[in-house]
Amino acid sequence: MTEPIIEFKDFSFKYNSQAEPTLKNINLKINKGEKILLAGPSGSGKSTIGRCLNGLIPNIDQGEVKGKCLVNGKDITSTSLFDFSFTTSTILQDADSQFIGLTVGEDIAFALENDCQPKDKMHQTVNQWANELKIKELLTQSPQSLSGGQKQIVALAGVLVDESPILLFDEPLANLDPASGLKTMAIIDKIQKELNATVIIIEHRVEEVLSQLIDRIILVNEGTIVADQPTNQLLHSNTLEKIGVREPLYLKALTAADVNLSSIKEVDQISTLPVSEKISDKLAAWTKQAKITKKEVDNLPLLKLDHVGHQYSKNQPYPLKDVSTTINQGDFISIVGQNGAGKTTLCRTICGFISNEGKITLKDQNLSDLSIKERAEKIGYVMQDPNQMISQKMIFDEIALGLRLRNVDEETIKQKVDQTLKICGLYPFRHWPISALSFGQKKRVTIAAILVLEPEIIILDEPTAGQDWKTYTEIMSFLKHLNTMGKTIIIITHDMHLMLEYTSRSLAFAKGKLIADTTPIELLTNQALIKEASLKRTSLYDLAKHYNLPDPNKFVQAYINFEQQNWKDEDYE
């Protein structure tokens, strides 16, 4: 019998800063060469399991260990971080925290330098992975100057050059555009096969991970393993959404159309679904009876961009250039496109964080006449990296800070902060220190700190990246509620389903230029725009094509309307 490369035996772990154990009586075996998806809600213990696999527990994170955890045959309690470095390579959720080199090229080469590789061999390997990941043009740039998605790709390259027997990916898709996400999964799959490496992927985006075959899905909830099954077996259950993890969209659509999934053997990919006239007829009938409604909009101009641009440096490959559009009162807009296309740069110019070419006006007032503070009273901005926004030690104080700076009375502050904490799923942690939170939980705190101020326009940079399905739904439902009240919401996102379900208008960017201003459905059914902006077709569209439905666009719209009609009418008053 093959010895497992990873084994947990009655393993529990309690951080010194916590009263209760984060992991409780874990029993798990992972064999050499397996590719595993580790999923679960935020705070479930997924990342803690990962920190056991790379030696951060117990070498860095101190706490109480019970039972055993063996990695490559060695007990983690008696293995140094140095020894772990030869066994487990990790891509962290926060890419900034693992950069070493002054340039992208130096950072990718760091592991090779430590392995004393010859200089010509290092250049060859770095160029190989830079070409594979399409980051050759970034090799001379500083990692800190890159967009969030570009940083994640560079971190991926830095891990892949080392060819360790265990590859641990903590939310590898969180900041990647859809096309890059699919490319990343294909690369991980290729490397795993070539090296027979053991791959563990910690990720909320289950559907994207399943674009490549996965051996097993392990679900963690409240510190325990609630499922450990082959992919198809797990997808036939309802365990994913029961614990707050989003199920693949095409499976939800099949279920909505009353298709019996238990009669289908392989459901992990659309291409493996049986082409059946019975299923096609059910989907077509469901589409035909669907009620499709369109929201009437008054289109009152609010924010106008006139030939707006910005260039960080002369060496920047694709500076933001000549963007002209009008944002209307009550719009719910998604800004999408390839990593480094200028999405975040545009929003920073709107907020006044960086200078801009051209003219930006809000209700006919030139924003260049306002200070950043004055702009902030009208335009709220939630950054992609929560660590760049947080300034207080306690969660409640961080969310209350903006209200206190505006001299709001403490009774009103408590009422507003408590309401926002509940909406963002943070109320149980209201007395916690920020330092005890996961990266995803910190992100929720920064969103709450802006939402509580109720500005006219709210701009959110990847608000749902790294969030579980329950939190995703709570945040987006709240934003939708604000939008129905007349708030204008702008979201930078790589989530195509978010764009379809929640936003009514999409701005697509590629290489610093605005290439499309249209509806989400029209954008995601235009193959030329999909390719140029590094997007991907929704699995709803692919499902409709797989079953030869006469109007795939109508099927997509029918399902989006179906989900919207099933939203709960939450009381936010």
Swiss-Prot record:
It is an enzyme of class 7 (translocase). Its main location: membrane. Keywords: ATP-binding, Cell membrane, Membrane, Nucleotide-binding, Repeat, Translocase, Transport. It holds the Pfam family ABC_tran. SUPFAM superfamilies: P-loop containing nucleoside triphosphate hydrolases. ATP 1 binds at G40, P41, S42, G43, S44, G45, K46, S47. Gene3D superfamilies: P-loop containing nucleotide triphosphate hydrolases. ATP 2 binds at G337, Q338, N339, G340, A341, G342, K343, T344. It is a peripheral membrane protein. It is found in: Cell membrane. GO terms for molecular function: ATP binding; ATP hydrolysis activity; ATPase-coupled transmembrane transporter activity. Residues 6-247, 303-536 form the ABC transporter domain. InterPro entries: AAA+_ATPase, ABC_Co_transporter, ABC_transporter-like_ATP-bd, ABC_transporter-like_CS, ABC_transpr_CbiO/EcfA_su, ECF_ABC_transporter_ATP-bd, P-loop_NTPase. Belongs to the ABC transporter superfamily. This is Putative ABC transporter ATP-binding protein LJ_1704. It comes from Lactobacillus johnsonii (strain CNCM I-12250 / La1 / NCC 533).
